[in-house]
Amino acid sequence: MKINNQYQEAEAIYPVTGLYIDPEGSAVEKSEMLLSEHRMDVYINDVLTMKLVCTPKDLPGLVLGRMVSEGMIHSSEEVEYLYICEHGTRARVQLGSEHCGLVNDNLSAEVMDTPTCCTDNKTIYSGFAVEKELQHLEPVKVSLELMYAFDEAFHQDMPLHEATWSTHSCFLAYKGKIVYSCEDIGRHNALDKAIGYALMHDYDFHECAVFTTGRLPIDMITKVIRAGIPLVSSKKTPTAEAVKLAQEYGLTMIGRAKNHKMMQYTLYQR
């Protein structure tokens, strides 16, 4: 896989001035830093496939991670090249010959929305999503050392969140060590960036674990299972349906993980 990233990352935060009113009714003009929204169209084999709204950081990982979590690819060997233009508004992905027959003539029938939390992400053409069925994971045991490392990394805060309080973070561990962290306006995007980083570095997904600052509903759990990552942790709580899905597919799920405390929702009998 070749990656040609022409985009020089732009500022993700901008100053905005407004009128601050305190509880006593006093008003004063005040400036603060706000997060920007970046839009990018993703073309796969020359077909407009996704429209992403994101924080303009780590764009190659976002594109590749989204392709993994949507079931389009599962290894870097399936991707011939990824190109991102100098403005970061257009990405082009060329897949290998095994994917070339997936484009059909009725693109309008393939329009669908994707889970986005607080962004306007859309999947325009879903014909490249070849991995329809989720695969059962090989369960893993929880490493308290890693869970505490996630907790400590989270409490050190991330630059954009510290400046704006507007981002979600995701941390990726490989073989028990944290190797990557990222931020995005959407929790789904942050997770996809971590998945994409693992793909770009040819990590065995089964030896990875992720920590997210976002909630864990079914759509987030589906992404983790589809990537083949056997452990997910969050400072938030999951939904009841997400716990059932994680249990069914052998995903170890940790929630309410902060201050060296946590709740293990699945596979805790092991």
Where do the model's predicted regions map?
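Intrinsically disordered, low-complexity regions enriched in acidic/Ser/Thr/Pro/Gln residues
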Residues: K2-K175, Y180-S181
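Histidine- and/or cysteine-centered catalytic micro-motif in compact active-site loops
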Residues: K175, E183-I185, R215
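Short beta-strand-to-turn element immediately C-terminal to the catalytic PLP-Schiff-base lysine
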Residues: A173, Y265-L267
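Feature captures the catalytic cores and cofactor-binding loops of soluble hydro-lyases/lyases
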Residues: R187-Q264
